[in-house]
Amino acid sequence: FVRHIHSNLKKRADLFTLRSGRRSLRAMTTSSLSSRGALAANNPLRIDHAAYHEAVANAYHPTENPTGALPLNVAENRLSWSDLRAKIESITTEETIAAWVPGYTSMRGSLEFRRAAAHFLTRHLTRCPVDPEQLAVSAGATSVIEMTSFILADAGDAAAIPAPCYPVYSQDIGSFSGVERYDLVTHHEVSEISDGPALTVSHLEHARTEIEAAGQRFRMLILTTPDNPTGGIYSLDTLSEVADWCITHEVHLVVNELYGLSLIDTRHPEIEADYADDVAFNSFASIMADKQSEYLHLWYALSKDLGISGFRVGLLYSHNAALLEAYENLNLSHTVSNHTQWLLQHLLTDDDFMTSYVAENQRRLTEAYAVVVGALKRLDIPYVPSRGSLFVWIDLSEFMVGDSEQADLALWQELYRTSGVLLTPGVGFGHTKKGLFRVVYPCVSMEELSVAMERLGAFVQAKRQRQGSSTSGDARS
């Protein structure tokens, strides 16, 4: 088990060296650590981590720092925080802290909070009854993913995830559990997924063949809907077909609905032409209820839909009694503060407020999304039409010099150093095409987002002018 963890960390550290061309200076001071610790000390959480903190320290301000940076690379939704903050402040002043808060409760989360969460999920996300006894609560989505992977899979097992996918899945499933990520490639060009994810049973069969040929067990399939980074939504028909395949082959299917309420209004007049079909989000919970299988599970968290990543609340929903029992016995180090659970219990059971909040947040998300895709259309930059999440997946491959990870990172760095706009680099998402980037659009104000799009436009136009001049020069020589 330890050997698999060490191997997984070593692969990540070597990959970081390949991508950045250097190791952290901290490598010289890790002799006091275990081999695992030394590798972790030299292996950043994500490749854009340092750049993000640099950008935040030099953040744009219209008057105080008009040439400052605009970080659009971390998945945070700040558009509706002012509304939520006012509500939370009213709870803390008007409600009396419950007697259960200062003591120990269930390691899967207090029953009071799980009841509130089940009520919220049933009313707003799943649209079918959620049993609080089948919920487990941990300190954030990362903890839920770590715990689930640790319990369901052994070190060296494979978890297939359709590419492109959230890069930090590798750490979430691998750092402690030793589970290895398999990038399930279903397409190359972004145009191939303009109507949504392209996953089929044939893709799963191909993945199983490759995984087993490598001497591994295909143990988990992880789907995110709405997807990160493409914003695509899996239809219920696709989810049902995939679920049947997974049950037959004893592969655990986990559907991550982290962005399930962060939906785009595809009828908005500025974007409606992008959508040929009206594909609505439907929760995987209804399929779980119908099939009642120990191989089907759902992840959720309050981080994105409510914009409270710092509160650290993630949820597992499953009909697998053994999984939930194991979770209870292992979750001590991942539990959520009782005070946080108490506070959010009151928030999630205020039906009028939450209904209004979700609707207004979706309206703001749609307006911000329209700003980004409006700019992309004017610039003739290809992108995947999003139906949900906090992202736009864009194609800047026309500006690539070469077709390597180094060239990918060079373009990302050039955009940031030239314009101050920091996107999420495509390196690490597992797809085959280079030159793709993720734009996080609700992490800044609408004014700041407009400035970022203006700067992106200036960068694109300057690059095209230089490319045109270079082409003309080549023709004359």
Model-found features: residue ranges?
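Eukaryotic N-terminal targeting leaders
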Residues: 1-39, 196-198, 465-477
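Hydrophobic residues in well-ordered beta-strands that form the structural core
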Residues: 161, 183, 255, 423-425
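PLP-dependent aminotransferase class I/II
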Residues: 295-388
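Conserved core of the PLP fold type I
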Residues: 98-248, 260-290, 454, 468, ...
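Conserved PLP-binding catalytic core of the aspartate aminotransferase-like
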Residues: 365-366, 379-418, 443
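PLP-dependent enzyme catalytic core of the Aspartate aminotransferase-like
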Residues: 111, 119, 129, 291-292, ...
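Helix C-cap/helix->beta junction micro-motif
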Residues: 248-249, 379, 419, 463
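N-terminal small-domain helix-loop-helix segment of the aminotransferase-like
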Residues: 31-140, 200, 348-350, 462-463
